[in-house]
Swiss-Prot record:
The lineage of its organism: Archaea, Thermoproteota, Thermoprotei, Thermoproteales, Thermoproteaceae. This is Crenactin. It is an enzyme of class 3 (hydrolase). Crenactin polymerization is inhibited by interaction with arcadin-2. Also significantly inhibited by elevated antibiotic A22 concentrations. GO terms for molecular function: ATP binding; hydrolase activity. Belongs to a conserved five-gene operon within Thermoproteales denoted Arcade (actin-related cytoskeleton in Archaea involved in shape determination). Forms the backbone of an actin-like archaeal cytoskeleton, which is involved in cell shape determination. Has ATPase activity. Shows highest activity towards ATP or GTP as nucleotide, and only residual activity on UTP, CTP and dNTPs. Gene3D superfamilies: 3.30.420.40, 3.30.420.570.
Amino acid sequence: MGVISDAYRLKYTFGVDFGTSYVKYGPITLNEPKMVQTRGLFLRDLPESVKMRIPPDVLARGLVVGDEEVRKYLSSVRDVQRNLKYPLKDGVARRDDEEAWRVLKELARYTLAQFPVSDPEFAGWLVAVALSALAPDYMYKAIFDIYDELASEFKIYAVTILPQPLAVAIAENAVNCVIVEGGHGNIQVAPISFALIREGLVALNRGGAEANAITREILKDIGYSDIAREEYAVEVVKRAVGLVPRRLKEAIRAAKSDPDRFVTKVRLSPVVEVEIPREYAWTRFLIGEIVFDPNHEEIKSYIEQSRLRIENAVIGDVTLYGEMDVASAIITSLRNVSVEIQERVASQIILSGGAFSWRVPPGMEDVAADSVTRVKIALEEKSPALASKVEVRLVSEPQYSVWRGAVIYGYALPLSLEWSDTTREGWRFPRR
């Protein structure tokens, strides 16, 4: 095939968003991406009676990915903790973690295998991969190497990589903005002016995982230690009962003075139900607040009594702040942007990611807030001048906006632009 046409790109651009918890993937033709958990199960320590029933090709690979496939073999593996591998921490795989890279390669293979192509005109996928803005250079190289290796198994025409916050800005058609991407592992605050302004990148070492962790501790306190061990159950409870307070102290005061108003139940299965009792109704607000600001006495007491840790971490030359609140992170990010363009960049703050997907139950509008309102209130308290000039909004699809931006980027990026390690732009063409 000669020149790749726009019509071709509208069919065969393929987006992959490698998140800490989920990989979202699929061609540009989808309304929304497919999702698979970012994990893999190594088939080690298997009893002989189990090995006999596993297909030889699966056994030979020694590794399975895909939600159904992992569940299928999970009960057969003796040491689940050793053999169930989550390759990304804060969106980054360690350079020397061979098992993590095996899982990422298998996930890349799995995502492409879901979309076989029989079109005789098919010259290969245009793959646009979104990685954490914290991803170091070695991770870019390793991802390119993975797709180089897969090119012999799947037709891949070219591969490009972009940072997740830039993908969100593209999906939102925002040229000047601050993207606040809240994932499971971390929160990335990234100023954008046509491209990512790396000097202004601020990262927080918390996200949806910390909301899960405090939910787990609350479940233990109210007598559901068995359920607290199951990550799936914890996630469901968090989503169902977690609340973001407008202001934490006022919300706790309201819940303690009228606990019946905040009592709730969650049915996890036909035979399992979780009830948040009156004396713990106020803790619902801690679940949402920990994402926005963990600097409260009530949250710190849970941290001290549990294995939950909120502390700084370092990835490459970037410090991830554990206790910095989201509003302070936005202000810090903007201070590192050239004064000349600060006001333009600050004109809109766009929230994205599952960590910002919170709802306000009917009748609780006086004490609970959605993410946009919570950030506005915090900015008004920290910087009234900034708050008066900025529009804060949530993307329409918080979980999918990175993938959507990736496929738009892959569709629009000129194929004449070859990859540059310096600018981190362009296409890499697999060795043929």
